[in-house]
Amino acid sequence: MPIPIDVSYGRSFSGTRRRIYQLLAEMGTSGDVIWPFASQPFMRSPGPLTPGRTEEWHSGVHAVLEEVLPEERIVWRFENEGVNGTHGFYLSQDEKKTKVTHRTVATLSDTEGRLFWRRLEDSHSRSMEALFAKMERVLKR
């Protein structure tokens, strides 16, 4: 039986949407200054973010860029077996701050997808918290 998931993590930052988008767009490249775990690298294919072409790999996730709208969102489609859905970063205004939300919306197959999410769920939560903490430090520089 397929299992739907909808998981979000968010935080508001003092940085501009332009700067925060730039930091997110550079993740997995030589310009990445916010991925928190050097021993568990975040990698993406080289070049500009191009839907249908740019790929990413991290924490057991393999995804292809589905949509990019500068200063608004970067959305990836899972390529992992048993997972049908997306995860991405969404930027919005929160009074004088910029809110960043990472949202995962997917349907998991009963076997592969459920096992994949079980392995990923805890590290995903820690990664989001650490990423947001590092982004906050970088934006204060």
Pin down the residues of each PLM region.
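Short, surface-exposed coil-to-beta transition loops
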Residues: 6-8, 58-62, 83-88
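Hydrophobic ligand-binding cavity/cleft-lining segments
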Residues: 1-46
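Hydrophobic pocket/interface hotspot
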Residues: 20-30, 65, 74-76, 100-102, ...
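A short, structured loop/turn motif at beta-sheet edges
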Residues: 14-18, 66-71, 90-99, 137-140
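Short beta-strand segments that buttress and anchor functional surface loops
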Residues: 50-58, 74-80
